């Protein structure tokens, strides 16, 4: 199920698409924080690839919510290149996993304050909690 809060008769397709992108970015932020908790360290930069990286709105929102830079991989072959890099490193033919990989392409820096990012994520988490509560109540 999905919900959209704050819809009115003036809400158009652009606002709905933006809401979906913001929801994706917020969920990724939750996952990154969970990974940081499991790793016991802070992620300093998020490197991304794939079709959704074509959305500058999503990438900027991601940087804003995480409060870290988001770097786009410059090749559409990121997965294959990553596998090759791991194989080279595993065969001791490279000194690091990243050796020989292209430098990141575009970089998005956070453009909102940490306090604003926290408020947006808290609003997202409250909305998710309301949806989860309504689902647990049954039909």
What do these predicted ranges mean?
Residues 1-139:
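Glycine/Thr-rich phosphate-binding loops that ligate phosphate moieties of nucleotide
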